[in-house]
Amino acid sequence: MATIYYEKDADLKILKGKKIAIIGYGSQGMAQSQSLKDSGLDVVVGLRKGGASWEQAKKDGMKVATIEEAAQQADYIQMLIPDELQGKVYHEQIEPYMKKGKILGFSHGFNIHYGMIKPGKDIDVVMIAPKSPGHLVRRMYQQGAGVPALVAIQQDASKKALQYALAYAAGIGCTRAGVLATTFKEETETDLFGEQVDLCGGCTEMVKASFETLVNAGYQPEIAYFETLHELKLIVDLMYEGGMAAMWDSVSDTAQYGGMTRGRRIINEQSRMEMWRTLEEIQDGRFAREWVLENMAGRPHFNALTQQDAEHPIEIVGKELRSMMPWLKQKK
């Protein structure tokens, strides 16, 4: 069973008197920096000067500096820019200021685990990874609650790295919910696997394939959309709220029997072999190297696949059907 840390295990005071630099002001950067500030900590946001995020952070009342200035000032530097940018930004704008005793933090272990960033041995390297999007991190903090998070320690030069990381987690509200201990290796490999096999890759390919099957069999695209994509949210919400057993309890017996008997034919031995193959590519670094090279080449494959999915018939019919759903317009 995982070790879980709570409020009683964290001492926010250990970060008082230290300056925290949040590098990036996207979903997580915005949520984490604002919550740390509201927790009474000294926070500066490191950004590219003149960019849209710079003005937004200033408008939100944050102290803003260039990445170099923030890194030079800070005792604790949290990297919250995209994975593919972190290595270059770290080496060019942060590494020169990583002096002994500083803390380097992440919310995803990709660059540390695969060696794109190799910090000196005299600094702490930690991870606090909230298990929710940034807007929910912020909303739960403001409501006096928090979202679960992961904590990992890669280097403990100070012998206080876990204390610093848990204090950071407390500063963004995560110790109110619980912080699970992991490693950079485990977080990185399981996160990538989930994205590729289930959450992003497997799910979208399953939806497209089932939609295509119905349309090619002569069913109306609109009906196929409802049955293969639209209703997916209903099922996922049930699993999210109560687990798979609760989901089965909520659907009809016909749906449960059909799903249990036929679902095992869809996810068959060949599918499981591909899951293992995908995991091996993550574990041995092949996927990481492929992604780095793809970015170096200007993302030709990434852009082609993105365009291909954008032009899929399910996108065309989906846009039309979503225009009939006023509750979606209200969210915008």
Swiss-Prot record:
GO BP terms: isoleucine biosynthetic process; L-valine biosynthetic process
Enzyme nomenclature, EC number: 1.1.1.86
Catalytic activity: (2R)-2,3-dihydroxy-3-methylbutanoate + NADP(+) = (2S)-2-acetolactate + NADPH + H(+); (2R,3R)-2,3-dihydroxy-3-methylpentanoate + NADP(+) = (S)-2-ethyl-2-hydroxy-3-oxobutanoate + NADPH + H(+)
Binding sites annotated in the UniProt record for NADP(+): 25-28, 48, 53, 83-86, 134
Binding site for substrate: 252
Ranges where the KARI C-terminal knotted domain occurs: 183-328
Highest taxon in the source lineage: Archaea
Cofactor(s) the protein requires to work: Mg(2+)
Residue sites binding Mg(2+) 1 per the record: 191, 195
Recorded metabolic or biological pathway in which this protein acts: Amino-acid biosynthesis; L-isoleucine biosynthesis; L-isoleucine from 2-oxobutanoate: step 2/4; Amino-acid biosynthesis; L-valine biosynthesis; L-valine from pyruvate: step 2/4
Keyword tags: Amino-acid biosynthesis, Branched-chain amino acid biosynthesis, Magnesium, Metal-binding, NADP, Oxidoreductase
Cofactor binding note from Swiss-Prot or TrEMBL: Binds 2 magnesium ions per subunit.
Entry annotation: catalytic residues: 108
First-tier enzyme category under EC: oxidoreductase
Binding site for Mg(2+) 2: 191, 227, 231
SUPFAM superfamilies in UniProt: 6-phosphogluconate dehydrogenase C-terminal domain-like, NAD(P)-binding Rossmann-fold domains
Molecular function as annotated in GO: ketol-acid reductoisomerase activity; magnesium ion binding; NADP binding
Domain KARI N-terminal Rossmann residues, every copy: 1-182
Disulfide bond positions: none
Described function: Involved in the biosynthesis of branched-chain amino acids (BCAA). Catalyzes an alkyl-migration followed by a ketol-acid reduction of (S)-2-acetolactate (S2AL) to yield (R)-2,3-dihydroxy-isovalerate. In the isomerase reaction, S2AL is rearranged via a Mg-dependent methyl migration to produce 3-hydroxy-3-methyl-2-ketobutyrate (HMKB). In the reductase reaction, this 2-ketoacid undergoes a metal-dependent reduction by NADPH to yield (R)-2,3-dihydroxy-isovalerate.
NCBIfam families reported for this sequence: ilvC, PRK05479.1, PRK13403.1
Family: Belongs to the ketol-acid reductoisomerase family.
Record's protein name: Ketol-acid reductoisomerase (NADP(+))
Organism: Methanocella arvoryzae (strain DSM 22066 / NBRC 105507 / MRE50)
Gene name per UniProt: ilvC
